[in-house]
């Protein structure tokens, strides 16, 4: 399975935005510099997050981006959908009829390969949905010294 680099970048952007004080914003260029990623690509990612209601953006001198809801209300699946889209991971090509032969294929009710892949996809969606970014933020809080990122956010907020 492949997740784009935008998915990981999105997770870190959201974790960084969680460090902002209420009512404050940060410019995306600071985020791209901090993460060492392309600003133009990160702006596209932020637009996707904005479209899904995960962040809010404000234009102008004191503009920037901020979370639009708490991390406890954002799951890995929400980010996945924002960045990767709502398309299914697997779409059947209906190869069962060719595999069995046309006549036998007519008797088959459901493809066992499709059933298995649907179960895998459902498990993935369930797991992604069950993990919130607040859980990840809590783990980061317990395992890392976040002083530097907090100081950095305070210096760059608007």
PLM regions with names:
Residues 52-53:
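Glycine-centered, phosphate/nucleic-acid-interacting loop/turn motifs that mediate DNA/RNA or nucleotide
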Residues 92-158:
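C-terminal regulatory/oligomerization modules of transcriptional regulators
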Residues 71-97:
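Conserved segment of winged-helix/HTH DNA-binding domains
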């Amino acid at each position: 399975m492949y997740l784009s680099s935008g998915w990981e970048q999105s997770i870190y952007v959201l974790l960084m935005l969680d460090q902002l004080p209420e009512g404050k914003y940060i410019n995306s260029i600071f985020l791209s510099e901090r993460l060492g990623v392309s600003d133009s690509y990160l702006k596209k990612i932020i637009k996707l997050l904005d479209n899904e209601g995960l962040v809010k953006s404000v234009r102008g001198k004191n503009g920037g981006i901020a979370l639009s809801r708490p991390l406890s209300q954002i799951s890995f699946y929400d980010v996945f959908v924002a960045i990767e889209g709502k398309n299914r991971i697997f779409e059947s090509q209906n190869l069962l009829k060719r595999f069995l032969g046309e006549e036998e294929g007519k008797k088959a009710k459901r493809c066992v390969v499709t059933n298995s892949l649907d179960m895998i996809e459902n498990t993935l969606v369930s797991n992604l949905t069950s993990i919130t970014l607040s859980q990840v933020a809590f783990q980061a809080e317990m395992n890392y010294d976040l002083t530097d990122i907090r100081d950095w956010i305070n210096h760059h907020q608007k």
